[in-house]
Every structure is written in structure tokens, then in C-alpha cells.
């Protein structure tokens, strides 16, 4: 293995220095075919995401899926692209979360960097930046409230790949998932209440939609569904809602396998026939708005619901760079720092 021999610009102080690393999924650099193709190729080549043997999966991916899908995905990204910053909302809000957390921790001398599992800015560059600021301890927060091998674990994998190339490694602490952390539930509760207060109608249901996962992953031991249940149970309790008033569903199914159910789209399209024509949708598995929230739910599902006879549809925004989001990240960071003392 070739080691990186670059010496950090600043040596750690005698007492040591801790830095915070935020890791999110990733995004194409733009909406063009080749940018989207590069991103999808990296994402769909991850064995944590697609567990099929590469000898079987890669020919399908490279010759079929990546020939056509970048066009459709690029058009979808274009609908939600942040024009002022020329970036996807996921990148914009992840950066703003890092900036907000950095401001909270500035007086403590704790720098904050952010990186993407797929695409730019890379996790390796974020680690390098923290070490250049004299950090010999890094606290990593994967921005996924509920654990899954397809998200949290692969983010950690990427962090440790970056460390594999360093001759002098910093000490690292990875923060566990936080599906029912009090600050997370408070932030979700506030987001729902603020959204409902601004509506001209009262939703008959608030549908909770989480990103789906193949059922086989759960059967093999992934705790994702259980953690989604923990989130929604705590949120229902905070809002005083029943299971019927806030049902749990799963979106974004891909491929022929059976995924965890109920599936969001069929569930929502069936509601008008049951007399439920006014709904809101919240996506508590996403820390920031992205393609799956703004387009798949905010555009596509809205259209399908209206075509099925729906009358009113509201989207509860993700936490993004809200005060509640920064409060949560600060709480997670400070708790981790308190337990991560220099030896």
C-alpha cells in the first residue's frame, strides 16, 4: 500500500485537538449526463448498496442502467437544483449544517469539516483538512438518523479507507445512529408544527415516508426498520398522534427484490378512495432535503395523489439548516467530545 507522506500544516498542540467530520451520501456535481453517470456508477458499485456479485452486477450496471438512467436522473435533479449556488440541495444544506455547527463550536476551538461518501467534497479531503488544522482526534457523524449498512456503515467504510493511507492516523470516534435522540425528536416536532401552522388546511393524515431497503437486508440483521419504528413512535408520542394519524411507509424501491413495506406510493395513492384527500408527508430518515424528498415525494408523489382524487398535499421540509438541526448536531458533538478524552 502506498502511504501519503504529506505532513499536516499544523502539528497537534500538546493537549491535542478534536475536529468534527459530517458525512452525507453525495450528489452529482451538475445535472449533465456524464456528471450524473459518474455519481451513479460510484453509488451503485458500492457492495454495501448492491450486494450482488460484481461479475453479475457490473455488466448490467455499466451496459444497461448507466446508459439510460443518467438522462432521467439528470432531468429530476434539474427540477430541484439550487440555481443560486449551482448545487444540489443536499450539498447546499450539508454545507450549511457544517457551517452552523462550526459557529457553535468556534469558541471551543473545534473545527468542523464535511464530506460525501460518493462524489465531492470527498471524505479524504475533509480528514486532510482537519489534520491540517492540528486535529489528532476526529469525531465522525454520519448524517443518517437510523442505522443501515447501506448508509451509516458505508460512510464509516469510506472514512477508514482514508485513514488506511495515512502513516500517522488521528484517533477516531464514530457517533452511533440517533433514531429517537431527544434533540432529533424535538427538531422533527417543531418542523411538523411550523409546517402545519402555515397551511390553509388541516391534514387528515401525516404520512411518514422513510427510504426503503430490500427485505433481505433486514432478514440478514440490518436494524434499519426497527430504528425507523423508534423514530416514528417517539414522534407520534411527541405530537400526540396515533398510528392511523401518522402511518409509516417506505419509498424509493429499486430493482426486482421485495423491499420493506408498506410502499409509500401505493399507500398514498389509495388514500382518496378511503376518504382521505388532505395529507402532509414527512421524511424523518433524511437530515436534509434532496432528490428523494423534493422530487420523488414533493413532485412525483404529489401528482400521483392528486390524480387519484387528492385535494391537498403538503411537504414537511427536512431539518436542513434549521436551529433544531444545529442543536442536534451540537448535542451529538458535545456528548461525543465529553467521552473522547486524550489518553
UniProtKB/Swiss-Prot annotation:
GO biological process: heme biosynthetic process
Cellular component annotations (GO), alphabetically ordered: cytoplasm
Name of protein: Ferrochelatase
GO molecular function terms listed in the Swiss-Prot or TrEMBL record: ferrochelatase activity; metal ion binding
Subcellular location: Cytoplasm
Protein biosynthesis among keywords: no
Short name of one Pfam family: Ferrochelatase
InterPro entries, A to Z: Ferrochelatase, Ferrochelatase_AS, Ferrochelatase_C, Ferrochelatase_N
Binding site for Fe cation: 211, 292
Organism taxonomic ancestry: Bacteria, Pseudomonadati, Pseudomonadota, Alphaproteobacteria, Acetobacterales
Signal sequence range: none
Domain of life where this protein originates: Bacteria
Function: Catalyzes the ferrous insertion into protoporphyrin IX.
Principal location: cytoplasm
Catalytic activity: heme b + 2 H(+) = protoporphyrin IX + Fe(2+)
Keywords for this protein: Cytoplasm, Heme biosynthesis, Iron, Lyase, Metal-binding, Porphyrin biosynthesis
Pathway: Porphyrin-containing compound metabolism; protoheme biosynthesis; protoheme from protoporphyrin-IX: step 1/1
Amino acid at each position: 500500500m502506498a502511504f501519503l507522506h504529506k505532513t499536516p500544516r499544523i502539528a497537534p498542540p500538546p493537549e491535542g485537538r478534536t475536529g468534527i467530520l459530517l458525512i452525507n451520501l453525495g450528489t452529482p456535481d451538475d445535472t449533465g449526463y456524464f456528471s450524473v453517470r459518474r455519481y451513479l456508477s460510484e453509488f451503485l458499485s458500492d457492495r454495501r448498496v448492491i450486494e450482488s456479485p460484481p461479475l453479475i452486477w457490473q455488466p448490467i450496471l455499466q451496459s444497461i442502467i448507466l446508459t439510460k438512467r443518467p438522462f432521467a436522473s439528470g432531468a429530476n435533479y434539474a427540477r430541484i437544483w439550487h440555481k443560486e449556488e449551482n448545487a444540489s440541495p443536499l450539498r447546499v444544506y450539508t454545507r450549511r449544517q457544517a457551517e452552523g455547527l462550526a459557529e457553535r463550536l468556534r469558541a471551543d476551538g473545534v473545527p468542523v469539516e464535511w464530506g460525501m461518501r460518493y462524489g465531492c467534497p470527498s471524505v479524504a479531503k475533509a480528514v486532510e483538512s482537519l489534520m491540517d488544522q492540528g486535529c489528532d482526534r476526529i469525531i465522525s457523524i454520519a448524517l443518517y438518523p437510523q442505522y443501515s449498512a447501506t448508509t451509516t456503515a458505508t460512510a464509516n467504510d469510506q472514512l477508514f479507507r482514508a485513514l488506511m493511507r495515512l502513516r500517522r492516523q488521528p484517533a477516531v470516534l464514530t457517533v452511533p445512529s440517533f433514531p429517537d435522540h431527544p434533540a432529533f425528536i424535538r427538531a422533527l416536532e417543531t418542523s411538523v408544527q411550523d409546517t402545519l401552522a402555515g397551511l390553509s388546511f388541516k391534514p387528515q393524515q401525516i404520512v411518514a415516508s422513510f427510504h426503503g431497503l430490500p427485505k433481505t437486508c433486514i432478514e440478514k440483521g440490518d436494524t434499519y426498520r426497527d430504528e425507523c419504528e423508534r423514530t416514528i413512535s417517539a414522534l407520534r408520542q411527541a405530537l400526540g398522534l396515533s398510528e392511523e394519524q401518522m402511518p409509516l411507509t417506505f419509498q424509493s424501491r429499486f430493482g426486482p427484490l421485495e423491499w420493506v413495506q408498506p410502499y409509500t406510493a401505493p399507500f398514498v395513492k389509495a388514500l382518496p378512495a378511503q376518504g382521505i384527500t388532505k395529507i402532509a408527508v414527512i421524511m424523518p430518515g433524511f437530515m436534509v432535503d434532496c432528490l428523494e424528498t423534493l422530487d420523488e415525494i414533493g413532485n412525483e408523489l404529489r401528482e400521483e395523489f392528486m390524480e387519484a382524487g387528492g385535494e391537498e398535499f403538503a411537504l414537511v421540509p427536512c431539518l436542513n439548516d434549521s436551529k433544531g438541526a444545529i442543536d442536534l448536531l451540537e448535542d451529538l458533538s458535545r456528548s461525543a467530545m465529553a467521552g473522547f478524552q486524550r489518553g
